[in-house]
Design a protein with these regions (language model features):
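Ser/Thr/Asn(+Pro)-rich, low-complexity disordered segments
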Residues: 2-453
Length: 453
């Protein structure tokens, strides 16, 4: 009891604020009336179908097997090999740049590794303190918010091609939203780091992220003008907004799944998509596994994302049953030009579209994603997710971590090694044993630590 009291005392500066947010969540979710079976939420824009938990084969929490624990140890090797002296981690093996999304992935991998007892407390503390201190000292785009990319060597602002830039190239609201997830874990579970988290956030003008309750990103055009644009599409938009809401930011519009929503039929499954097309809104729009997998692993979903996520999973299983092609798709780095591909359930009006960041066809690089495979395996207990797990379980470097995926056409490994892939593998395996990352008030009582034989 004395340790609990001490932790509460350390966190008192944040508890009053977070209690208010918790009450806000209680008000929102209290308005949702659960009914067995499938129900429909009537909205002005559309009807969102809600599947009951009983109809979704969710994986039950259990201890990791010895094989799964070894997989987690393999994932951690990536971070052992790619951490710089300032605490930042390379986004790609030996590539000395990182976005805030990559840094968030590292922090969540670090928390996962510690909670799975892969690293000792002093290592966790030292790594956490080092990266938080570096984040608190980052130069900011227009002195407001973190730039889209930084050198992991110098912590200076860079372009996406890792060229140093004094001004910066803008900020990503989605990336900033993601890093709020580990920040909230630190505040609630490791309150000794609350002052450092506050030190970071006091540097950032979070109000610049929002306009009319929507997420706003910043970019720089060819003339050097700063452009402020709505950021996020179905899945990612709500995921990032959810984490920012925990910090008292009004993002009620961004959290409304129904605003730009419609279903499309993908191999007999009604999958939710975003009506905001690239030609109208000058932004790419994809349906992929990742935002729904992360929402499940980190938040345990809400009733809408739980159903939308399950539809995305079902479509991928349906493609496998129809074609015999193992399917678990997401965006991934690849080990050859163009080096980054969106392998999608649906994009630009096409099912199973694979495109580059510029929207160009990349079908020849369509892949089975390691992070999507293991993420889906962690969330859903089905014969198909077991097949995904088995297919991907040897797709790694014993020295450097998990490869990004397996190419469909050749069956060869996509040997890109990234922070994001290895972080999601760690998060997924942690989820199997300990449940969602953000579990206020019940983490300590449910924590398990010993693997099965």
């Amino acid at each position: 009891m004395s340790q609990l009291s001490e932790n509460l005392k350390k966190a008192r500066g944040s508890i009053v604020f977070l209690i208010g947010i918790t009450l806000a969540f209680g008000t929102v979710f209290g308005l949702e009336q659960w009914k067995p079976g499938k129900v429909k939420m009537m909205t002005a824009a559309n009807v969102i179908e809600i599947d009951s938990d009983a109809s979704i084969p969710l994986r039950k929490q259990r201890n990791l097997s010895s094989l799964e624990l070894d997989m987690a140890k393999t994932a951690w090797k990536y971070f052992d090999n790619n951490t710089q002296d300032n605490g930042l981690v390379n986004s790609v093996h030996n590539y000395t740049a990182a976005t805030l999304w990559d840094t968030a992935s590292y922090l969540l991998a670090l928390i996962s590794a510690y909670e799975l007892k892969l690293i000792p407390k002093n290592d966790f503390d030292q790594r956490s303190r080092l990266v938080l201190e570096t984040l608190a000292g980052l130069p900011l785009f227009e002195d407001k918010l973190p730039n889209k990319s930084y050198s992991t060597l110098s912590a200076s602002m860079t372009t996406y091609t890792n060229q140093q830039t004094e001004r910066g190239v803008g900020w990503s609201a989605i990336d900033i939203g993601r890093i709020m997830v580990p920040f909230n874990v630190y505040v609630w579970r490791y309150p000794e780091f609350t002052p450092l988290v506050e030190k970071v956030l006091l540097q950032w003008q979070l109000d610049a992220l929002v306009k009319d309750a929507e997420l706003i990103g910043a970019d720089v055009d060819e003339q050097g003008n700063t452009l402020y644009l709505q950021e996020g599409r179905l899945g990612y938009e709500e995921y990032a907004a959810k984490s920012l809401l925990l910090n008292g930011i009004d993002l009620s519009e961004a959290l409304d799944y129904s605003r730009h929503f419609e279903y499309v039929d993908i191999d007999g499954v009604r999958v939710g998509t975003d009506l905001r097309t690239p030609d109208q809104f000058d932004a790419l729009n994809f349906v992929v596994s990742e935002p729904y997998v992360l929402d499940g692993l980190e938040f345990g979903w809400d009733r809408y994302s739980r159903s939308l996520s399950y539809r995305v999973y079902q479509a991928q299983e349906a493609r496998y049953k129809k074609t015999g092609i193992m399917t678990a798709v997401s965006e991934d780095n690849i080990d050859q030009a163009p080096y980054f591909v969106y392998n999608t359930v649906f994009a630009d009006g096409k099912a199973w579209n694979a495109v580059t960041e510029k929207g160009e066809d990349a079908s020849e690089f369509r892949s089975l994603s390691s992070k999507a495979s293991i993420g889906l395996y962690a969330l859903y207990d089905t014969d198909y997710t077991q097949k995904l797990f088995n297919r991907i379980s040897d797709n790694y470097s014993s020295d450097n971590g998990w490869y990004a995926g397996i190419y469909e056409a050749s069956g060869k490994s996509n040997k890109a090694l990234t922070a994001n892939t290895n972080a999601i593998v760690l998060e997924a395996l942690r989820y199997i044993q300990l449940g969602p990352m953000i579990q206020i008030g019940r983490f300590a009582s449910t924590q398990k630590t010993s693997p099965e034989g």
